């Protein structure tokens, strides 16, 4: 059974039918994929985008869009996103043991790595996982391989809408951080 992001957010009390408002009728790269914003909590979310783990393991959904596959370098938007995330989140991760859940090619981890005690990526797409391990950034495809209470913070960008059971996954992530840690 898959739970929509909306249902998950409603269950934890950060949105409702009356406060959920259409924020945009598209994402940066997908026309017709609605982006919602809750008028009370400010939470922005995409609903119902889980396509199955196999899609994320082989990475085929990215092949036709990847400038990096053609040039060896990330595109401007991806680089810009990584820089913005770095600037916004360094204060939460500096000096800490962190993980990036759904880290993709590891752009964020590569930027924060020099400032953190340790970093680890959690990523299903095998070529990204292999590439990160090859450049010395630890990466796994198995959340359970990370000890409970071993991290200070876990970040995740544009991942929750791709999960079949978001609340269960968030609960699993929470177990991996120390008491008082961030998810």
Model-derived segments and spans:
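Conserved N-terminal segment of class I S-adenosyl-L-methionine
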Residues: 1-157, 166-170
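Phosphate-binding active sites in nucleotide-utilizing proteins
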Residues: 162
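A short glycine-rich, Lys/Arg-flanked "PGG" loop and its adjoining helix->strand segment in the class I
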Residues: 167-182
């Amino acid at each position: 059974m898959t739970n929509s992001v909306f249902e998950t957010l409603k269950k934890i009390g950060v949105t409702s039918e009356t406060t959920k408002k259409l924020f945009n009728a598209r994402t940066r790269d997908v026309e017709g994929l609605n982006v919602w914003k809750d008028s009370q909590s400010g939470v922005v979310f995409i609903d119902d985008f889980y396509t199955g783990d196999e899609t994320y393991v082989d990475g085929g959904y990215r092949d036709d869009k990847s400038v990096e596959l053609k040039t060896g370098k990330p595109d401007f938007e991806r680089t810009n996103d990584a820089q913005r995330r770095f600037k916004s989140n360094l204060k939460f991760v500096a000096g800490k043991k962190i993980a990036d859940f759904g880290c993709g090619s590891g752009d964020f981890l590569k930027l924060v790595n020099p400032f953190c005690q340790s970093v680890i990526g959690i990523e299903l797409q095998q070529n990204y996982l292999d590439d990160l391990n090859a450049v010395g950034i630890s990466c796994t495809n198995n959340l359970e391989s990370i000890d409970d209470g071993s991290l200070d913070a876990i970040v995740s960008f544009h991942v929750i809408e791709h999960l079949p059971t978001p609340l269960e996954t968030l609960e699993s992530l929470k177990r991996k951080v120390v008491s008082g840690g961030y998810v």
